[in-house]
Amino acid sequence: MIDILRDSKTIAVVGFSSRESRAGYYVPAYLQQQGYQIIPVNPYLEGEPLGETPYPDLQSVPVPVDLALIFQRSENVPPFVDDAIEIGANAIWMQLGIRRDAAAAKAKAAGLQVVMDRCALVEHRRLRAQQVL
């Protein structure tokens, strides 16, 4: 987890939400404030959330993605993991409450680092407080 947060620069947020009260918005907003490049991924987004161009899917993202941060129901995760593998992402992070063991195993077998059922905001703050990041 430390390596993922330390080494990632570009984070594609699958399931980015335009609602500020949802974790799919405020977690990436926090990460952007910490210096990460955030790429919203959601086919239904309009405008430029957080000042960034949104993309309908991971394959449409025109830059290399270090981390695919997933805000989707657990049962919906497998195709996003497949997409992350296909585009050459370095890691998959399934947000708090999201776990899909078979998809995680597939990602690991493809060489990706995987985090499941953890909040990226909480973990980033915790690691910063420990002066690890």
Language model regions located:
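Active-site regions of enzymes building and remodeling cell-envelope glycoconjugates
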Residues: 51-58
